[in-house]
């Protein structure tokens, strides 16, 4: 007869009417009993021919990922002027005095961050934007391109200008100034002199060296200005001679991707020095130099739009090397859906290319990408905005994968010990936290994203559009791109993007200037950065608590008024070093902090409501007597494992599932096992904070017997049959807890100390987890253990009772270190009587 749930519950000693523990508990360690129960509950690994279930509720196997939904109305989030100040360390020292070694080490890691993988694979530009949404390919292309442009404008990306140069927007760092193109020493060596250099207030100089140097910078680029082969021979000064060998001939570009260039651009390049030095009046008097408004940064760097679009339109009629977009202007419409109808909507489509406020030299950067990008919803609760997903998975795969640095994350007990208190809490939201941390420019060639341009993207997607080299640039080939779908998509996009359609239709290559989210190094760097900042804050305000995990920062103080004062001071400090906070998303939690999926109060910690709701939904949809794919079991265990510490039997209850996942076998839920798990997860118990105390109860065991020392009382007992030593030690600890009720127990067994009961016989592990719940263990060496003699049957010998203090720990976590307090000569940071006379330390 199958084992019913009440019988199973009684067997696990979860009911009050169980017999004496010393008799009942050792039975649970019996292998035969564990095997029979597993057979009754159908927990043996099934060898069944029934097809596996690959979906349970929202859980699917890892290989059947849900298709993301495209939203044509996605908004691109705005990125504020994120610029982490380079003098961050000196500002922290002004705020709190000398920094500790830990803080200095962590802050130096990210000023700037470095990333140099062993091997980097380069992919063609067509793989730059992933075709995740085939039905909305053009829309997705432009939205992604707009997102990348926004990041570049915000100073988060470099734009590859040529094989060895890049431009960027925003405030420069000192290491970028060292790589600056127009540094005086460089030009003096080259013999260009300094008369063509504009002194910049920021220390970065705009690239204005004369004539051919400027020209060569664009000529060598596959994405910038390119001339016919004959024009390249003109450049004889500067570096253009060296660069000529690397130039790709324009004929390699299919139609629609050829860089914009006309005969006039040669003259423009030769006049570049004088162009940069024109006054504003001369600019206005000479509008042919640029049809778009010139942008001026704080450093007065002038954006140069190299090709006057009007001239391109007039000269490009039969030119192979004209801009693909503007070629349609004078073309005869091929149909009602010809792109020429859209191109003729505007007289001025703006520049083909934009260049940043500052130029720097970079290591050799090929015209390729190292990762693809696509858009998804910003998060499940915000589907109006998009988020850019960058796939740099090449660095985590294969034999050349990068082994990312590991860092400790606080476990549940450590987190509860640290944060479970009677403080008032609030959490801060750091805007685009990853994009605060600067990356060394030498890492740019390893982290490239971009797009191949609209024409090549469309040609790749449409079956009837083929690119032939011998047809390159002919009108017939030009109209191969025209289609109803493309026409309608572009017409709709024209409403929102306007003349940027032209800019975005050109190819571009961008490299990361700040750390990207898709690389395993980034979480490590972010965790080190925020934990160092929190350490500084804790030392400045020793009567308060600041803690962080990744970009989640929490502040705690004794009263609401004190917390508000702390919030103002900390916010001002963070803003002063360039950390951008989203103040509208600041959450005030009162006394129950919501953090890392937990609710933490003075009573302990519990999972947040949305996780409890997910678990209930999971059990509601869980089928019985049906083989469930082990990959789906992984998802189920991931959810249940998060809440396991809050249940009676904890992780051991999930061991049958773990076993089937390890064996890559399907798992069948029997009604009894499902009822057992369901009951476990419907009643969750808080994990309480450990409190310091004195250990006065000790346990020890041998394979044949157990012994306890409870105060001055000694007890001993024997097992019916010899047991493995770890099992015997665990039983002794359970007896000590049940007989004394003490929540601090001394033991000399490391496995019991670890409180991981998953390696014991299954039934014993489940029962022991419930008996020892909330118990703290102290290590006592065997030679000093007062319970050692009773366990060996010697009751007459009394060793002196040790005074073993137990001190809760915040775990081996790199994210929290006890910070020494601030030197006393610094002024007090909170300008009113603090509610505490002594410095508050985490419990």
Swiss-Prot record:
Keywords: DNA replication, DNA-binding, DNA-directed DNA polymerase, Endonuclease, Host-virus interaction, Hydrolase, Inhibition of host innate immune response by virus, Inhibition of host RLR pathway by virus, Magnesium, Metal-binding, Multifunctional enzyme, Nuclease, Nucleotidyltransferase, RNA-directed DNA polymerase, Transferase, Viral immunoevasion. GO terms for biological process: DNA replication; symbiont-mediated suppression of host innate immune response. The record marks 63 as: Priming of reverse-transcription by covalently linking the first nucleotide of the (-)DNA. Multifunctional enzyme that converts the viral RNA genome into dsDNA in viral cytoplasmic capsids. This enzyme displays a DNA polymerase activity that can copy either DNA or RNA templates, and a ribonuclease H (RNase H) activity that cleaves the RNA strand of RNA-DNA heteroduplexes in a partially processive 3'- to 5'-endonucleasic mode. Neo-synthesized pregenomic RNA (pgRNA) are encapsidated together with the P protein, and reverse-transcribed inside the nucleocapsid. It comes from Hepatitis B virus genotype F2 (isolate Argentina/sa16/2000). SUPFAM superfamilies: DNA/RNA polymerases. This is Protein P. InterPro entries: DNA/RNA_pol_sf, DNApol_viral_C, DNApol_viral_N, HBV_DPOL, Rev_trsase/Diguanyl_cyclase, RT_dom, Viral_Replic_Matur_Polypro. Residues 284-308 are annotated as: Disordered. Terminal protein domain (TP) is hepadnavirus-specific. Spacer domain is highly variable and separates the TP and RT domains. Polymerase/reverse-transcriptase domain (RT) and ribonuclease H domain (RH) are similar to retrovirus reverse transcriptase/RNase H. The polymerase/reverse transcriptase (RT) and ribonuclease H (RH) domains are structured in five subdomains: finger, palm, thumb, connection and RNase H. Within the palm subdomain, the 'primer grip' region is thought to be involved in the positioning of the primer terminus for accommodating the incoming nucleotide. The RH domain stabilizes the association of RT with primer-template. It catalyses: DNA(n) + a 2'-deoxyribonucleoside 5'-triphosphate = DNA(n+1) + diphosphate; Endonucleolytic cleavage to 5'-phosphomonoester.
